[in-house]
């Protein structure tokens, strides 16, 4: 009988785990990594050339994207091999038929996801968003934050006027008063915060942001390189270890590489918990499935999806994931 997509995925990800600590028999000629401004581990790894050191015979190329949906479009089109996004872009991509696999994750960053209003806004509670224009990147983690926040306030998605804009355009619309609120993530959040002109209506705490970033690979790439992905993550975790040991150094790296003011990067780091990359767990799949169901119930994706079809729990890439012990003020 011909193997199903789920069977192939299970076999592949089991193979990734089995080869987690083995050396690649043949490294690829090129490795194309998609990243965003908020991807500290990838930015630090790029600066320190951790992947280039680990794979000396491979040309490593980093490609920046403004948000997760654009990154996954490129991944599905074959323009990149692996990338990191928030929790929602993979749901939209799977619903659209993209041939992708969840291969790794970072912990949730609830302090780095917010809904902003201007400091003089009459909007003081989530319930006040009713009838208002809210800007955000469609299919992003901010989309999920907004949806959960509305539900928590007893509102439906249809109670607001969504304005779908990428981060830079959303910032312009927000600053010009063309929208009433803005759902966004760091470092865009920190850049707005430091102007002193915004008020945080809510962040991702209290169950509004229960998933972290995900690393996804194009399935053909992962199938061609079954022993490569765990080694990539082990190299990227060198960047996380460096950040934990010397946060000031990583702040300087982000400032130089991304062209952001140091104060913005320092603010982002203050919202960022320890973020080691680990393999997908059953809890990750459960959380993603609940979120996917929520989006389908609100008619935001065209069909129901089964997250387990493109992800399965595996043996940890390195050490067990650290528990986020950040204290809520």
Model-derived features: positions:
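Short, glycine-/small- and polar/acidic-enriched structural segments
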Residues: 27-153, 161-164, 180-184, 209
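Pocket-lining segment of extracytoplasmic ligand-binding domains
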Residues: 88, 163, 168-256
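Bacterial N-terminal signal peptides that target proteins for export
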Residues: 1-11
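Conserved C-terminal helix/tail region of periplasmic/extracytoplasmic solute-binding proteins
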Residues: 293-329
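Bacterial N-terminal signal peptides
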Residues: 9-20
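Secondary-structure end/capping motifs
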Residues: 223-300
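Boundary at the C-terminal end of the N-terminal hydrophobic targeting segment
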Residues: 20, 24-28
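Small-molecule pocket liners
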Residues: 41-42, 109-115, 198-199, 211-215, ...
């Amino acid at each position: 009988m011909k193997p199903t997509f789920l069977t192939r995925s299970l076999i592949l990800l089991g193979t990734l785990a089995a080869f987690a600590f083995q050396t690649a028999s043949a490294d690829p000629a090129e490795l194309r990594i998609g990243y965003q401004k908020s991807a500290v581990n990838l930015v630090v790894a790029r600066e320190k050339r951790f992947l280039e050191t680990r794979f000396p015979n491979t040309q490593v190329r980093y490609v920046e994207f403004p948000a997760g949906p654009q990154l996954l479009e490129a991944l599905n089109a074959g323009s990149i091999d692996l990338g990191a996004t928030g929790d929602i872009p993979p749901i939209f991509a799977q619903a659209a038929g993209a041939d992708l696999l969840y291969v790794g994750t970072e912990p949730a960053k609830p302090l780095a996801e917010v809904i902003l209003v201007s400091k003089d806004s009459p909007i003081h509670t989530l319930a006040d968003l009713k009838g208002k224009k809210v800007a955000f990147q469609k299919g992003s983690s901010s989309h999920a934050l907004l949806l959960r926040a509305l539900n928590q306030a007893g509102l439906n998605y249809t109670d607001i006027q969504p304005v779908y804009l990428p981060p830079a355009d959303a910032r312009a619309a927000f600053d010009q008063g063309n929208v009433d609120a803005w759902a966004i993530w760091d470092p865009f959040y920190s850049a707005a915060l430091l102007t002193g002109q915004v008020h945080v209506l809510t962040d991702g705490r209290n169950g509004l942001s229960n998933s972290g970033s995900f690393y996804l690979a194009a399935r053909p790439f992962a199938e061609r390189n079954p022993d490569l992905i765990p080694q990539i993550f082990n190299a990227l975790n060198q960047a996380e270890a460096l950040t934990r040991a010397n946060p000031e150094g990583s702040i300087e790296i982000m400032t130089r590489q991304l062209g952001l003011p140091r104060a913005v990067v320092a603010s982002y780091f203050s919202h960022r918990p320890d973020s080691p990359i680990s393999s997908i767990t059953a809890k990750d799949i459960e959380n993603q499935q609940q979120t996917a169901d929520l989006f389908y119930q609100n008619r935001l994706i065209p069909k129901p999806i089964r997250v387990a079809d493109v992800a399965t729990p595996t043996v940890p890439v390195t050490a067990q994931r650290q528990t986020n012990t950040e204290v809520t003020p």
